[in-house]
Curated annotation (Swiss-Prot):
Belongs to the peptidase T1B family. The lineage of its organism: Archaea, Thermoproteota, Candidatus Korarchaeia, Candidatus Korarchaeales, Candidatus Korarchaeaceae. It is an enzyme of class 3 (hydrolase). Pfam families: Proteasome. This is Proteasome subunit beta 2.
């Protein structure tokens, strides 16, 4: 089981990525302030669940490779580029178990908003929404019930917050607040929502 909860969903004109801030291991809370949502470039981000050392290493390697790609090709990497590179990185480490992480990639390209979900072995799927981690079943239930095509940004942010709050309230491995990354054609912004947990 991958620790924590992370999710992403599309809306009309953008994407929302979210993750909790708790890091726990072997029954202990190690941190209540870990960032698990990352902006990769102006139009692509990643939300993560798993062991911090693993997803931080993945994000660092990803950012380096994306920067090199953008410099060599003189164009910004798309969400599809980022997701495929992450898939390769995860697949390369599948036998050694290097990366104990699940990720949601979200962003915008010329064809509109995109959400991709990746498992620890590099499996890659494009979805309208997805949740990963120990609270994924709870968050997915909320997303399946209330997601609709053509949602506004406000509706999508509210749905992401609701799904994360439900996961945090029922999953002991998730908690201590919600980081949100909203990406539209106008830019991106991060928000933090405090969540009181027992």
């Amino acid at each position: 089981m991958v620790l924590a909860t992370a999710l992403g969903l599309r809306f009309d004109g953008g994407v929302v990525l979210a993750a909790d801030r708790r890091v726990s291991y072997n029954g202990f809370i190690l941190s209540k302030s870990a960032r698990k949502v990352f902006l990769i470039n102006e139009r692509v981000g990643v939300s993560t669940a798993g062991l911090p050392g693993d997803f931080q290493e993945l994000v660092d390697v990803l950012k380096y490779n994306i920067t090199m790609y953008e410099l060599e090709n003189e164009k910004a990497a798309t969400p599809t580029n980022v997701a495929k590179l992450l898939s390769i990185l995860l697949y390369q480490g599948r036998f050694s178990g290097i990366y104990y992480a699940e990720l949601v990639v979200g962003g915008i390209d010329n064809s509109g908003p995109k959400i991709f979900v990746l498992d620890p072995a590099g499996g890659l799927m494009e979805e309208n929404f997805s949740a990963v981690g120990s609270g994924a079943q709870i968050a997915t239930g909320i997303l399946e019930r209330f997601f609709k095509e053509g949602m506004s940004e406000k509706e999508a942010v509210e749905l992401a917050e609701r799904a994360m709050r439900e996961a945090i309230s029922r999953d002991a491995l998730s908690g201590d607040g919600i980081d949100l990354l909203i990406i539209t054609s106008k830019g991106s912004r991060m928000e933090f929502i405090p969540v009181r947990t027992a």
